[in-house]
C-alpha cells in the first residue's frame, strides 16, 4: 500500500516547496501539491510542518544511557531506535581513543549488530576518533593512548571491521599523518580533522 505526506513544505534543492510525497516500495516520489491520492492509501497530513530528509549523524558517542565504547550489539539497537524517533535515519558509531583490545571489542559488537534484525536508524559504520590525535588538543581523549601515525594498526582495525570503518578523525600535525592520508583513503576511510591546532600551511 502506498503512503502519502500531504500539505507540508518539502525541502527540495535548498528551499521549501509545497509538494506531496508518495512513498512506494521504499522510494520517495515528489508530486505536485494537488496530485490525486490513491484509494485506500495511508495519508499523513503535514499541514504547517516542514518535511526534510532524514539526518545522517557522523559523530555519535552514545544516547539513551549507552556509551559507544562500552556498547553491545543490543545497545547499538537502542541507539538506532532512539535516533529514528528524533529525525536521524543513519549514523556512525564514534569510538573514542581506547586500548587496542577495547577498540577491537567495539568493532566486534558493531559486526554482531549488523547481523541482527533491527528497526530504527541505519548504523552505517564506524567512526574512529583517534588514536592519531594531538595531545595538546586531546579534549576527553586519554593522553597515554594517543599515537603517532600507525598505518599497520589502522589496516588491522579496518580488516577486522570488514571495511566498515567509514570515517576517522585525525590531527594532521601528528608526526607522519599527512603522508598517510592517501593510504587511509585507499582503505575506504573518509579523513576528518579534529583535536587539532593545525594551521593553513599544515
Q: Where do the model's predicted regions map?
A:
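Divalent metal-coordination and catalytic microenvironments
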Residues: 8, 26, 48, 59, ...
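Di-metal (Zn2+ and/or Mg2+/Mn2+) metal-binding site signature of metallo-dependent hydrolases
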Residues: 49-71
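A glycine-rich helix N-cap at a beta->alpha junction
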Residues: 113-121
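Metal-dependent catalytic neighborhoods of phosphoester/phosphodiester hydrolases
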Residues: 101-112, 139
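Histidine/acidic residue-rich metal-binding segments in metalloenzymes
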Residues: 113, 147-202
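Divalent metal-dependent hydrolysis catalytic cores, especially in the metallo-beta-lactamase
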Residues: 61, 77-106, 121-134, 161-173, ...
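Glycine-rich phosphate-binding loop of ATP-grasp-fold ATP-dependent ligases
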Residues: 136-145
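Histidine-rich, glycine-flanked metal-binding segment
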Residues: 1-6, 10-52
Amino acid at each position: 500500500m502506498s503512503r502519502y505526506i500531504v500539505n507540508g513544505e518539502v525541502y527540495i534543492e535548498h528551499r521549501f516547496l509545497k509538494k506531496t510525497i508518495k512513498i512506494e516500495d521504499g522510494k520517495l516520489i515528489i508530486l505536485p501539491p494537488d496530485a490525486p491520492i490513491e484509494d485506500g492509501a495511508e495519508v499523513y497530513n503535514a499541514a504547517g510542518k516542514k518535511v526534510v530528509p532524514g539526518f545522517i549523524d557522523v559523530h555519535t558517542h552514545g544516547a539513551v544511557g549507552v556509551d559507544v565504547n562500552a556498547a553491545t550489539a543490543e545497545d547499538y539497537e537502542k541507539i538506532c531506535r532512539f535516533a529514528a524517533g528524533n529525525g536521524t535515519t543513519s549514523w556512525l558509531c564514534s569510538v573514542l581513543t581506547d586500548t587496542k583490545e577495547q577498540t577491537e571489542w567495539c568493532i566486534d559488537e558493531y559486526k554482531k549488530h549488523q547481523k541482527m534484525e533491527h528497526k530504527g536508524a541505519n548504523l552505517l559504520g564506524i567512526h574512529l576518533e583517534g588514536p592519531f590525535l594531538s595531545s595538546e588538543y586531546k579534549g576527553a581523549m586519554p593522553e597515554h593512548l594517543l599515537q603517532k601515525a600507525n598505518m599497520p594498526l589502522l589496516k588491522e582495525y579496518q580488516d577486522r571491521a570488514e571495511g566498515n570503518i567509514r570515517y576517522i578523525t585525525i590531527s594532521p600535525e601528528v608526526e607522519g599523518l599527512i603522508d598517510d592520508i592517501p593510504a587511509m583513503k585507499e582503505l575506504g576511510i573518509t579523513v576528518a580533522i579534529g583535536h587539532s591546532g593545525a594551521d593553513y600551511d599544515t
